[in-house]
Amino acid sequence: MGARKHNSAEARKEALKQMYFAKLRNVPTSPRKMRLVADMIRGMEVNRALGVLKFSNKEASARVEKLLRSAVANWEEKNERKAEEGELFVSRICVDGASTLKRLRPAPQGRGYRIRKRSNHVTIYVDTLNNDNN
């Protein structure tokens, strides 16, 4: 590996140590449906976001709620203390498309219609409201 590439990789590694995130991979829900849930909590304070997700009637909200709890636990693990009320917020949430399973549905006259069963990857980043202590 060249020196420039090595230095940029080290810088990325150091930047990741300052971020608090959780990833959920290969979720069997379409990215479009998952983005509806992600848009509900983007930029919200964590406790309020957990309340919104708990009472949402979307199927994807239970998965995002569990992922958000994991991101908060990751923050607590890195900082070696419990998160206080109103201290954390959802700084970023990304929903990216994952692999698609393709299936055939029988159609008239010997044809087959393609069914695309989509899946996605979700990444949640949490951060403190006041970044003075980091």
UniProtKB/Swiss-Prot annotation:
GO terms for molecular function: rRNA binding; structural constituent of ribosome. Pfam families: Ribosomal_L22. Keywords: Ribonucleoprotein, Ribosomal protein, RNA-binding, rRNA-binding. InterPro entries: Ribosomal_uL22, Ribosomal_uL22_bac/chlpt-type, Ribosomal_uL22_bac/org-type, Ribosomal_uL22_sf. The keyword Cytoplasm does not apply. GO terms for biological process: translation. GO terms for cellular component: cytosolic large ribosomal subunit. Transmembrane segments: none annotated. HAMAP family: Ribosomal_uL22_B (MF_01331_B). NCBIfam families: rplV_bact. Belongs to the universal ribosomal protein uL22 family. Part of the 50S ribosomal subunit. This protein binds specifically to 23S rRNA; its binding is stimulated by other ribosomal proteins, e.g. L4, L17, and L20. It is important during the early stages of 50S assembly. It makes multiple contacts with different domains of the 23S rRNA in the assembled 50S subunit and ribosome. The globular domain of the protein is located near the polypeptide exit tunnel on the outside of the subunit, while an extended beta-hairpin is found that lines the wall of the exit tunnel in the center of the 70S ribosome. This is Large ribosomal subunit protein uL22. It comes from Porphyromonas gingivalis (strain ATCC BAA-308 / W83).
